[in-house]
Amino acid sequence: MINQKTASLIAASCELGAITTTNDKSDRKSTFEYGNNLGMAFQIKDDLFDFLGSENETGKDSGGDVKKNMITLPLIFCLENSTRSEKKKLKTLVRSKKKSNSNLREINDLISELGGFDYSKNKLQEFSDKAVAAIDGYNDSETKNSLIKLVEFNVSRLK
């Protein structure tokens, strides 16, 4: 699901940049892979903000995705890696029509206990590393440095 959102947009944008500057298909592939992995990392970071950030900190409504019944990576991981009773509890909380702050805190606590946040943070780093590896073959340059800094910024960004 995340690949159909932000990742595909960023990947296509990066590949278009390469198309306008070179005929080398390997450059196009590298920039596409860079963009796809950066996009995946960006979306995961956004998913984490939804659970772990406050609106004042991130500019994003805390729990907004859950309130809209959107299933994001931390939830997917927990639903796939929990006991039947944990899964039932999580589904009940997420499907609740009215999601109070107390309800959202309980969802966050359960995701934390089940390892959903740690898993998502690890995947964020994994996709970030893949983005940098995709452009590893490029000569060192200001442009390459900028692309690497963009990946690093995404990992550490607070908004």
In which residue ranges do the predicted regions lie?
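All-alpha prenyltransferase/terpene-synthase fold signal
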Residues: M1-K159
